[in-house]
Amino acid sequence: MEVFSFGSYYPGDSAIHRLDPRTKLLLGFVFLITTLTVSSFCGLASVAIFIVLIYTVSRVPARLVLSSMAPLLAIVAVVAVLNLFSDQSGRILWQLGFLQISEGSLRSAAFMACRLSLMMAGMSAITLTTPTLDLTAGFERLLAPFARVGLPAHELGMIMGIALRFMPQFATEMKQTADAQASRGARVTGGPLGGVRMLGSVAIPLFTGVFRHAETLSAAMDARCYHGEQGRTRLHALTFGRGDALAAVVTALLLACVIVINLQLV
């Protein structure tokens, strides 16, 4: 059974699924910038409402959203822990030598964890509602104007597409390898230490499989006489529609809302 991870696509025919991939990529960039400018929990609440609206319209099950974000939550945990010792304002709650945790550091850690989680949820919405080939085509079309100055737009799009395609397969093979190790009698213990030990036992067969898939992919591309963008055509042309304009308006409203909230706190 395939493991649902970041980069997986959930088939559907919602208004979000039908958006042009260029619109999703551009608005995704605006969303990231908007989320980075948020300076309060009220602003994060408006971003959270925006994300809930997206997933409600796209009709992607919540369990798949959480499953796609699960591999990235370790990054959130690391960022939160680092922020525990960054802001030392307010009353000190715990201290050990030069390390101390205060009310301000707890607030900062919670804020950064929420912000990063919302950013991941927003970007997961793009990969969950857009096939990899469409994302690759959209990314390539956005970079096409820079091809005149020597930027390899097609090659960069191909790299992004291959990376996104291999993420779910990488997660699936990691689970299969871990299950195979457990079925052969490998001890699986809970907690962070057990996870590190299990990761060490699956690392070699996992990366061996990754290199094998890479070699198979290169052989398949050579067999199909792939020589880059030259001479390639596309079956479906990318076109903007009314839905793309509406999505841009909604994203602009989110940006305006965040700006207003930030100005009120100044």
Language model regions located:
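Alpha-helical transmembrane segments and their membrane-interface exit regions
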Residues: F50-V60, A74-V78
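Membrane-interface helix-boundary motifs at transmembrane edges
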Residues: V60-L66
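Hydrophobic alpha-helical transmembrane segments
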Residues: L25-L26, L44-S46, L66-M69, L73, ...
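Transmembrane alpha-helix interface motif
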Residues: M1-F41, V47-T56, R141-L151, E155-M158, ...
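A diffuse structural propensity rather than consistent per-protein peaks
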Residues: P61, I101-S102, G241
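Juxtamembrane/interface alpha-helical elements of multi-pass membrane proteins
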Residues: M69-G185, T189-P192
